[in-house]
Every structure is written in C-alpha cells, then in structure tokens.
Amino acid sequence: MNGRFEKRDGREVIVKEKGKPFRILQLTDIHIGGSLGTRKKDELALAAVEKIVKNANADFVAVTGDMVYPMPLLNQGTRNNLKSTKMFASVMEKLGVDWTVVFGNHDSEVWAKLNKEQLGDFYSAQQHCHFQKGDPDIFGVGNYCIPLLNEDGSLNTALMFIDSNAYLTWNFFSGFDVIHDDQIEWYKKEIKALSNDGEVAKSLAFFHIPPKEFKEGWEKCYRGSSEATYHCGFVQEKDNYFGYPKTKEGKFFGEMVKLGSCKGMFMGHDHLNTLSMTYKGIRLTYGMSIDYNAYKGIAKRNTQRGGTLIDIYDDGSFDVTLLPLSDCK
C-alpha cells in the first residue's frame, strides 16, 4: 500500500511514497435499505463492495454519497438509517482499508432517524474512516480537505470533500440543492492556504450531485465539439438524464474554472451514468454505482455496477479507470 496518514500542523494529511501512484477507489450510491424487504439486495450490494475493494488494491476509498436509502414509504429501506449505515460501515471496517464518505441526498431523508450531524459523528468515530464534519459555520456537513503530500512535504494534490446538499426544502419534490456560496469560498480559502510561490495548488473534488455543466460538456462532446474531450463510460439514464439542480443556479463549476485549482470532480447520484470527460480543463467523472435497490429493475442490470480508480502520480497528474464488478474475481 502507498500512503500513510499523519497529523501535521493540527490537520490530517496523507504522505505519498515517491515513485508509486497513490490510488483512490471511488464508490458511490450503495443504497443499503436495512429492512427485511431489502435484505437480499443489501447482501448483494455489500458483497459487491467487498469484492471491488479487494480487487482495487486502493490506498484510500472515497464514497460519494447515498450510502444508505431510508425510504420506508416505498418499502425500500428502514427509517432507521443508523442501522443501514452500520451495515455499510461494518463491511468497510472489516476490510481494514482507509476510507471516507460525503453525504448524498438520500442518506438523511426527512423521515430518517438520524440527521447528517448525527451520521457524521458515527462515521468520524470509525477506526479507519477519515470523515470530518468540517466547520459548523459553513453550510452542509462534511466539507473538509485532506492534503496529499509528497515525501518531501510538498503538496501533491488537495483532496476536497464537499457536501453537495440535498433538496431546496425538506422534500424531494422541491428540487435538488446546489453547493452554496460559503462552501465555494471555503474551498477557495483552503486552496489559497495550500498554494505556494504564486502557483495554485492542484485539487480533486469529491461530492454527490453533479453540476449542470456536466451535461453541457457532454452535449458538446456528443456533437463532436473540440471544447470537450470524451475519455470513457456512458450516459445510460433514460432520455440522457443528468440529475443536476434544475431550479437553482449553481456557481461551483464556474468558480472552479476561474480558480484554476480543481483538475477533477468525482460524483455519483445518477446510477446508470458512468461518463468520464474533460470540459473547460476539469475532468468530470460519474463513479460506477453499486445500487441494487433504488432504481426499479436495477438489480438485473450490470454494466453500470463497479468502482472507479484514480491513480495520482508524483507530479499531481492522474488517470481514471473504470473497474466494473464483472471484471472483479
């Protein structure tokens, strides 16, 4: 394994071994229900997580939201989201890998037993989980930075974990929320503090709900425009759906382009999309999902199921590779 976690100047960092890529495995949309009705699907999802982690040979696992699915009204999960969260965390802890999460829109639905603050306390108490609740004065729970350092102590890449929030009001029908202005300012301040000699620090961002510019870039790519570059994966949601916020204008992507720090964004949310492409200098990637529960009939589909590998090199460059569950032994 490459990379060791340390505390330096009061914050957690990862120190990368020279000459070896630091590998992150992105998992997303596990959707553990935790109810009697979802027992078999939960078993399949947790077995898939275990198989993918064992095959990935990753130094760190980043889970980009919707670990659980407390949807009792649809008989797709118990409102006791602590139970389902424990089911997922116990598998990760048993594997002994360093891991972390950001929240999706489903982890703490309005009828769920625990809110994000309480779930955050649980995650941060796990031995191998590196989740941080972040500054309580900033919107959301789980806005935090883990710097990836080179052996000489210089910054390689800032790993930025962001709560992309859930809904505009208390329920799904109000539409998806955006990353808020104060979260964007927090990101900028973190990067400014990590930057040296006028060179903007490189960063990768991990969050759940995609920005609208992901679809904008895909449409340009689909039309053969040189403004966007296709790398791998597919858009398989019905009618080429991208689940970005439709009723509120998000500023995150545009501000990241201006900042010049963020080289990659890794998301989930749309379970059938696995697209990875570059638009306006930022690699936009839908992680392969796990879900056997939330989408009707998804247990019988498999082309979208798996993990996503991110290999970061000494100079801060990185590669992205899809790891389908079907390729895992």
Show where each model-derived region lies.
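Binuclear metal-dependent phosphoesterase catalytic core
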Residues: 2-3, 12, 145-153, 251-259, ...
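Active-site environment of divalent metal-dependent phosphoester hydrolases
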Residues: 33-36, 69-72, 101-113, 167-170, ...
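Metal-dependent catalytic neighborhoods of phosphoester/phosphodiester hydrolases
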Residues: 37-41, 65-90, 107-128, 217, ...
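His/acidic metal-ligating clusters that form di-metal
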Residues: 56-60, 158-161, 173-270
